């Protein structure tokens, strides 16, 4: 179902026409122990894409509204949220078949109108159970996330249970379907199957150790069916005015279900960083391995934009695998009377895991400003090809406000 600016306005009005006397974003008391919490978020983004191949540059201006409510009484709650995305320009390929725009580069933000979340939940202290269409983000979203960067959010039809016993936390989910970022008009919008997410962690004085198992058996997305088992550790160590950070992850993945390719591949990640007086420095290596060039380690449910470069050249791991060697530097500072500025620069070198192939390198730059509930963001990514894909440049301007 396609959205329009009128859909956006209707959703916004429905959320904002709540009883008065409550500040934006504050729960509204309806009765003794019963509250209504309006949900409203608006994101407007301008994105350009230039590729060194015979395609017209993409020039996309899109807007997204998420609007709804959460009704709570005691330990129980009901949450309903709609999502509408509209295209304010059409000079880009939105990935929808038959759109007549295949001569443009891709910006995967099609017009869309959908029920984004519809869930009931029970919570008692550190324990909770959530049933329905919901947002799921596990750890840093490297394996399971909501793809928050794109306009259409990725959500799951699932039952999820969480609890904590002292320093130990447990998280288990069974999902029967995932709604992707491609919108309701796309054949790639919804994938059903038997999806199991198991995640458990132990908090330590200076960090946390986590074990996980992600079992993905899709009904039709067969080449994404896999079993992944792994562990990760993250630690922080203050040394005078400097805080040192270290992260490491090890995982193994193999085919399952109807996957037509039999393979086993490993995942390795190591990251060292330091912060001092709002300065950030860090470097690391992430390797999505290959099984002899037959297939690479895949993370089909991840928030992929956050990893392996913002130019999105590696949303699917090549069959020869991927080794991403990266370094980053950043700085946060407050501007009096304005807000908090966040600057970040990242360099990536990309190589294969199998076959000693160079893929290229990339520079990513970001500048953000947070002002109360609003945020403003400018980003730039420049990928320089070396035997893989083509030179690609992307630029974004974005503003967002949420209540």
Place the predicted regions along the sequence by residue.
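Sequence/structural signature of outer-membrane beta-barrel proteins
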Residues: 45-51, 87-89, 136-147, 175-184, ...
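Cleavable N-terminal export/targeting peptides
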Residues: 1-32
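Outer membrane beta-barrel transmembrane domains
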Residues: 192-222, 228-235, 306-317, 324, ...
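Extracellular/periplasmic loop regions
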Residues: 93-108, 245-346
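Beta-barrel outer-membrane channel/assembly domains of diderm bacteria
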Residues: 21-133, 159-164, 233-246, 250-251, ...
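Outer-membrane beta-barrel translocator/channel fold
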Residues: 177-183, 207, 215-220, 242-270, ...
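Outer membrane beta-barrel
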Residues: 61-183, 194-208, 268, 272-304
């Amino acid at each position: 179902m396609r959205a329009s600016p009128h859909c956006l306005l209707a959703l916004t009005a429905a959320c904002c026409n709540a009883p008065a006397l409550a500040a934006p974003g504050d729960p509204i008391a309806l009765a003794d122990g019963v509250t209504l919490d309006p949900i409203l978020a608006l994101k407007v983004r301008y994105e350009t894409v230039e590729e060194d191949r015979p395609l017209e540059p993409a020039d996309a201006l899109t807007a997204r509204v998420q609007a709804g409510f959460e009704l709570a009484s005691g330990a129980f709650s009901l949450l309903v949220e709609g999502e509408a995305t509209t295209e304010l320009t059409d000079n880009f390929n939105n990935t929808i078949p038959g759109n007549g725009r295949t001569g443009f580069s891709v910006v995967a933000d099609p017009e869309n109108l959908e029920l984004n979340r519809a869930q009931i939940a029970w919570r008692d202290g550190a324990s909770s159970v959530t049933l329905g269409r919901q947002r799921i983000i596990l750890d840093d979203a490297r394996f399971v996330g909501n793809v928050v960067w794109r306009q259409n959010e990725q959500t799951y039809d699932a039952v999820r249970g969480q609890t904590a016993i002292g320093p130990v936390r447990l998280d288990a989910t069974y999902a029967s379907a995932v709604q992707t970022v491609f919108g309701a008009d796309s054949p790639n919008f919804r994938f059903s199957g038997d999806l199991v997410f198991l995640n458990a962690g132990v908090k330590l004085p200076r960090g946390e150790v986590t074990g996980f198992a992600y079992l993905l058996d899709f009904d039709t997305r067969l080449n994404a069916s896999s079993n992944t088992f792994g562990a990760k550790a993250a630690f922080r160590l203050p040394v005078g005015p400097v805080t040192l950070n270290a992260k490491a992850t090890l995982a193994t993945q193999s085919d399952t279900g109807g996957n037509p390719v039999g393979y086993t591949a490993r995942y390795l990640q190591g990251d060292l960083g330091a912060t001092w007086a709002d300065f950030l420095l860090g470097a690391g290596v992430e390797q999505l391995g290959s099984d002899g060039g037959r297939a690479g380690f895949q993370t089909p449910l991840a928030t992929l934009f956050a990893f392996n470069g913002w130019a999105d050249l590696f949303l699917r791991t090549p069959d020869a695998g991927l080794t991403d060697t990266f370094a980053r530097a950043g700085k946060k500072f407050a501007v009096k009377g304005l807000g908090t500025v966040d600057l970040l620069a990242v360099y990536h070198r990309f190589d294969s895991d199998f076959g000693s192939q160079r893929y290229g390198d990339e520079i990513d730059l970001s500048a953000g400003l947070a002002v109360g509930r609003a945020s403003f963001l400018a980003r730039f990514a420049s990928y320089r090809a070396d035997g893989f894909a083509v030179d690609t440049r992307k630029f974004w301007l974005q503003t967002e406000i949420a209540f």
